[in-house]
A protein has these predicted regions:
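Intrinsically disordered, low-complexity proline/glycine-rich segments
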Residues: 1-175
Length: 175
């Protein structure tokens, strides 16, 4: 896997992996990171990159929140709390807070913002492209953090789509 810093100028694209329920973040055919579901019955995902590996697992009474943990030690790295619209807040123990928002219905664009509203990255659901903000000064954000944000945002996009599909099935069955 290549580091995300080597891929910033060339563009990043998410693609589905063949024969399993996973995705790869690629730049010019080279893998930057991967996201795999633990099993078809599990809501836990494993994300891997040159900068680290993490577990994303649902938390809370109705499993609406998500916890990010280090896949080796199991230590909690961050907690995501969604709001009523599907967007939410990602909080790290060091105090850094990010807002994950989306705009659009048919082809939404998901954006990660600093707590002050500065855009960090955007992911277009239709083209599956990741755009890192040109104004972002990576000096205050580690490469690992930027990689984790790109991978976690894709995970939240997939989780939101699955939740919507489940709700549609529930409505169809009860109607």
């Amino acid at each position: 896997m290549i580091p995300i810093s080597t891929a910033l100028s060339d563009g990043l694209i998410w693609s589905k992996t063949p024969h399993n329920r996973g995705y790869e973040l690629r730049c010019n055919g080279k893998i930057v990171g991967s996201l795999q579901r633990k099993s078809c019955w599990s809501s836990e995902f494993r994300a891997e990159s040159a900068d680290g590996s993490w577990k994303f697992r649902r938390t809370g009474w109705f499993h609406t929140g998500t916890e990010i943990a280090d896949s080796t030690s199991g230590a909690r790295i961050a907690v995501y709390k969604p709001n009523w619209s599907g967007a939410g807040t990602l909080v790290f123990p060091d105090g850094l807070t990010f807002r994950i928002t989306y705009k659009g219905f048919w082809r939404p664009v998901w954006t990660v913002l600093t707590d002050g509203g500065q855009p960090i990255l955007s992911i277009r659901s239709h083209g599956r492209t990741v755009e890192i903000s040109k104004e972002l000064h990576l000096s205050h954000l580690s490469e690992e953090r930027v990689t984790l944000l790109a991978m976690f945002t894709w995970h939240i996009m997939q989780q939101t789509a699955e939740d919507a599909a489940s709700a549609a099935v529930a409505v169809a069955v009860t109607s």
